Amino acid sequence: DHHHSTDEPSESSKPCCDECACTKSIPPQCRCTDVRLNSCHSACSSCVCTFSIPAQCVCVDMKDFCYAPCKSSHDD
């Protein structure tokens, strides 16, 4: 059965974003436009998914910063 551990999140579940768009306002309004399969990153509070299989999900949270890029952790 699925249960969420209360331990420190692993490296892979830390919020990260490769495609991040910010406005030029102060403070900036930033939104991560990464498309992920079946879920959004761990810190996302507003996750919007398509009804396809697998679902394509985008986090629509507005932040005043961008998360660290995901790519750096696993280079091909």
UniProtKB/Swiss-Prot annotation:
The record marks 24-25 as: Reactive bond for trypsin. Disulfide bonds join 16-70, 17-32, 20-66, 22-30, 40-47, 44-59, 49-57. Pfam families: Bowman-Birk_leg (PF00228). The keyword Disulfide bond applies. Keywords: Disulfide bond, Protease inhibitor, Serine protease inhibitor. It comes from the Eukaryota. The record marks 51-52 as: Reactive bond for chymotrypsin. The keyword Hydrolase does not apply. GO terms for molecular function: serine-type endopeptidase inhibitor activity. GO terms for cellular component: extracellular region. Belongs to the Bowman-Birk serine protease inhibitor family. This is Bowman-Birk type proteinase inhibitor DE-3. It comes from Macrotyloma axillare. The lineage of its organism: Eukaryota, Viridiplantae, Streptophyta, Embryophyta, Tracheophyta.
